Amino acid sequence: RPRFCELAPSAGSCFGFVSSYYYNRYSNTCHSFTYSGCGKNANRFRTIDECNRTCVV
């Protein structure tokens, strides 16, 4: 899996509400979270399927 999958999720610092997904390295699963619209890192996906394909072993 790519190294960015190990990053903690980042909600960002703006005021938007975008439903997103991140990979949780401890449970080896993807979870939903609310992204603010800016200040992201690479461990953010638009769909749970994209997260699973990229990060779940």
Swiss-Prot record:
Family annotation (SMART domains): KU
InterPro entries on file: Kunitz_BPTI (IPR002223), Kunitz_BPTI_sf (IPR036880), Prtase_inh_Kunz-CS (IPR020901), TFPI/VKTCI-like (IPR050098)
UniProt site (Reactive bond for chymotrypsin): 15-16
Keyword Metal-binding: no
Subcellular localization(s) per the UniProt record: Secreted
Pfam families: Kunitz_BPTI (PF00014)
Keywords for this protein: Disulfide bond, Protease inhibitor, Secreted, Serine protease inhibitor
Disulfide bonds: 5-55, 14-38, 30-51
Domain BPTI/Kunitz inhibitor residues, every copy: 5-55
Keyword Secreted part of the UniProt annotation: yes
Membrane-spanning parts: none
Entries under PROSITE patterns matching the protein: BPTI_KUNITZ_1, BPTI_KUNITZ_2
Tissues in which the UniProt entry reports expression: Expressed by the venom gland.
Function in brief: Serine protease inhibitor that inhibits chymotrypsin. Also interacts with vasopressin V2 receptor (V2R/AVPR2). Inhibits vasopressin binding human V2R in the nanomolar range (Ki=7.87 nM), and also moderately inhibits vasopressin-induced cAMP production (IC(50)=208 nM). In vivo, intraperitoneal injection of this protein into rats increases diuresis by 1.6-fold, without any loss of electrolytes.
PANTHER family: BPTI_KUNITZ INHIBITOR DOMAIN-CONTAINING PROTEIN (PTHR10083:SF374), KUNITZ-TYPE PROTEASE INHIBITOR-RELATED (PTHR10083)
UniProt name for this protein: Kunitz-type serine protease inhibitor
Naturally occurring in which organism (per UniProt): Naja naja (Indian cobra)
Taxonomic lineage from the root: Eukaryota, Metazoa, Chordata, Craniata, Vertebrata
